[in-house]
């Protein structure tokens, strides 16, 4: 029996609809939600991602400020721009597009962003709050995955979940979010020795390897009725693919996300939601 496709385009639109209403409410209070983006260099993929984020903001009524910097920008120069945005009361969210040129340090850069404007959820402050169940701004992809579970009414309590990623952007924040839902989470990575066996016993598999030459999730690696969330995206044999062979696993899984059209749209939608949250926080602090 074929499983159910978790359609990120449909779910992300439902998030955008809610955000659009929230934007209207904030504007009625005299607050104009604004996202500032910072792009360093001329990486074509990064430029495309930023354009997509600006387009999504326009759809829901969020104002954007675009800062394009030369690839030779120094750390001191980038720090100064971030500090200026931190002090700009008209800006509610700050997003520095990653990756950065090699002369710039990602940790130093993200640490400079005000936690109240950290719409990517990457500052050490917000990462710590997440571990303590107190974060208002959470990394967009992990929160997008959680939104997918909520949309389909998928219960996480007591579930055995294999999470194949340990990055600061996906694996670590998602681990905390799943743990908060009383799931049993096993984090796997490139040094995990019994990955296939762990996957075969999992109720839910969330995979974000991003290299089909190294890893492909197939139906023989999952149990009947498992749920598969594919966070990865890469180009393989001239196609955009995830980690999972979707057409194969959907014959065995109860739910699965396609690539493209799965988790990807959710990441942008949750960025919009975080921007609204940040704007709301700023209005509360200003009272």
Curated annotation (Swiss-Prot):
Biological process per Gene Ontology, one example term? L-histidine biosynthetic process
UniProt keyword terms in alphabetical order:
Amino-acid biosynthesis, Histidine biosynthesis, Hydrolase, Methionine biosynthesis, Multifunctional enzyme, NADP, One-carbon metabolism, Oxidoreductase, Purine biosynthesis
InterPro entries assigned to the protein according to its UniProt record, in alphabetical order: Aminoacid_DH-like_N_sf (IPR046346), NAD(P)-bd_dom_sf (IPR036291), THF_DH/CycHdrlase (IPR000672), THF_DH/CycHdrlase_cat_dom (IPR020630), THF_DH/CycHdrlase_CS (IPR020867), THF_DH/CycHdrlase_NAD-bd_dom (IPR020631)
Q: Which Gene3D superfamilies match?
A: Leucine Dehydrogenase, chain A, domain 1, NAD(P)-binding Rossmann-like Domain
Per its UniProt record, what Pfam families does this chain match? Answer: THF_DHG_CYH, THF_DHG_CYH_C
Query: Listed GO cellular component terms?
Result: cytosol
Q: EC number(s) of the enzyme?
A: 1.5.1.5, 3.5.4.9
What are the disulfide bonds? none
Q: Which reaction does it catalyse?
A: (6R)-5,10-methylene-5,6,7,8-tetrahydrofolate + NADP(+) = (6R)-5,10-methenyltetrahydrofolate + NADPH; (6R)-5,10-methenyltetrahydrofolate + H2O = (6R)-10-formyltetrahydrofolate + H(+)
Highest rank taxon of the organism:
Archaea
**Binding, NADP(+):** 165-167, 190, 233
Annotated metabolic or biological route of this protein: One-carbon metabolism; tetrahydrofolate interconversion
The molecular function GO annotations come to: methenyltetrahydrofolate cyclohydrolase activity; methylenetetrahydrofolate dehydrogenase (NADP+) activity
Q: How does it assemble?
A: Homodimer.
Its function, per the record, reads: Catalyzes the oxidation of 5,10-methylenetetrahydrofolate to 5,10-methenyltetrahydrofolate and then the hydrolysis of 5,10-methenyltetrahydrofolate to 10-formyltetrahydrofolate.
Give the record's family classification: Belongs to the tetrahydrofolate dehydrogenase/cyclohydrolase family.
Name of the protein in its database record: Bifunctional protein FolD
Instruction: Give the species.
Output: Nitrosopumilus maritimus (strain SCM1)
Phylogenetic classification of the source organism: Archaea, Nitrososphaerota, Nitrososphaeria, Nitrosopumilales, Nitrosopumilaceae
